[in-house]
Design a protein with these regions (language model features):
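A hydrophobic, helix-centered structural microdomain
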Residues: 5-81, 152, 194, 199-245
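A residue-level structural signature of the nucleotidyltransferase/glycosyltransferase Rossmann-like core
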Residues: 31, 51, 66, 106, ...
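Hydrophobic structural segments characteristic of membrane proteins
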Residues: 1-4, 102, 116-117, 123-245
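Short, motif-level signal for alpha-helix interfacial/capping segments enriched in acidic residues
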Residues: 1-2, 13-14, 97
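Short, cationic motifs built from Arg/Lys/His that form the positively charged side of catalytic pockets
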Residues: 19, 58-60, 64-74, 107, ...
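Aromatic-acidic/polar surface patches that form glycan- and anion
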Residues: 13-17, 32, 100-107, 116, ...
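Short, glycine-rich, amphipathic interfacial segments at transmembrane boundaries or analogous
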Residues: 53-106, 165-183
Length: 245
C-alpha cells in the first residue's frame, strides 16, 4: 500500500498492476461498448438528432488536460454557462453537489438523465482508459473552469490517475459536499492499492442504484415545486461537448 503525502509535482506513480487491469478490463468490455454504441446511435435519431458522442476537455493526472469522451445526453449546442454558474455555487457554498439534471434541466435530452445517473453516458471513457489518460478507478476529471476555482490543497486530488469510478462516487457522491469530495479523493491517492480498487469496483453497482433513486426523487420533487431550467442555445460546434460529472 502506498502511504505518503502526494502533490501535483510529486504525484502517485501509476502501478503496473493498475495499468494491466485497466487494459484487460477494457478489452473485455469493448464488445459491450460497441453494442451499446449501436443502440445509442439508433435511439439518438429519435430522441435528439445529432452526434452520438461528444468530446470535452478535462483536467486529470497532474493537472494535465485531455479530451474526454461521453455519450451525448444534452441538446446540441446547449449553453455551458448555466453549468459553470452551478459549479461555482457548489464550490463556494460547499453545499451537497446536486447535479443539474436532478433539477429537471431541460437541456438534457429525453432519457438522458437516466444515462447520466446510471453512469452509462461515461462508457466511451473506456477509450480514455486505453489511451492512458484515465483508469477504471480514480478521482473524476473536472472541466478546466472548475479546476481554476480550486485552491492549491484541493488540487491534490489530481495527483492520482482519474477514473470512471472512485472512492467519492461510492461514498455518497451527490450527497457529499465539494470539500468531502476532495478529502475522499486525496485519501484514495494516499492509500492506493489493488485491494482498495477492488472494493470500490464492487461498491460501484449499489452506489449507482442509489444515485438513480436519488435523482429520480429529486426530479419528482423539482417538478412539483420548481420550474425547469430553460435551455439556452449558443452558436458552437456540436462536438465541443458539454460540462458533465
Amino acid at each position: 500500500m502506498i502511504r505518503f503525502t502526494p502533490s501535483i509535482t510529486h504525484p502517485v506513480p501509476v502501478p503496473g498492476w493498475k495499468r494491466f487491469v485497466d487494459v484487460t478490463a477494457c478489452m473485455v468490455a469493448l464488445p459491450v461498448f460497441a453494442l451499446f454504441t449501436l443502440v445509442m446511435t439508433l435511439v439518438m435519431q429519435f430522441a435528439s438528432p445529432g452526434p452520438v458522442f461528444f468530446r470535452q476537455e478535462r483536467v486529470g493526472y497532474r493537472g494535465r488536460r485531455f479530451m474526454c469522451y461521453k455519450f451525448r445526453t444534452m441538446i446540441v449546442d446547449a449553453d455551458s454557462q448555466t453549468h459553470q454558474r452551478h459549479c461555482d455555487g457548489m464550490i463556494l457554498s460547499n453545499a451537497p453537489m446536486t447535479k443539474m439534471d436532478a433539477r429537471r434541466d431541460s437541456r438534457v435530452i429525453p432519457g438522458g438523465w437516466l444515462l447520466r445517473a446510471s453512469g452509462l453516458d461515461e462508457l466511451p471513457q473506456l477509450i480514455n482508459v486505453l489511451q492512458g489518460d484515465m483508469s477504471l478507478v480514480g478521482p473524476r476529471p473536472c472541466v478546466p473552469y472548475e479546476y481554476e476555482k480550486y485552491l492549491p490543497r484541493q488540487r491534490e486530488r489530481f495527483c492520482a490517475m482519474p477514473g470512471l469510478t472512485g472512492l467519492w462516487q461510492v461514498s455518497g457522491k451527490n450527497r457529499t459536499t465539494f470539500e468531502e469530495m476532495v478529502r475522499l479523493d486525496v485519501h484514495y491517492a494516499q492509500n492506493l492499492s489493488w485491494w482498495l480498487d477492488l472494493k470500490i469496483i464492487l461498491m460501484t453497482a449499489p452506489a449507482l442504484v442509489l444515485q438513480i433513486s436519488d435523482t429520480s426523487r429529486a426530479r419528482k420533487s423539482s417538478a412539483e415545486n420548481t420550474p425547469v431550467y430553460a435551455p439556452v442555445i449558443r452558436a458552437t460546434n456540436a462536438s465541443d461537448g458539454l460540462p458533465g460529472s
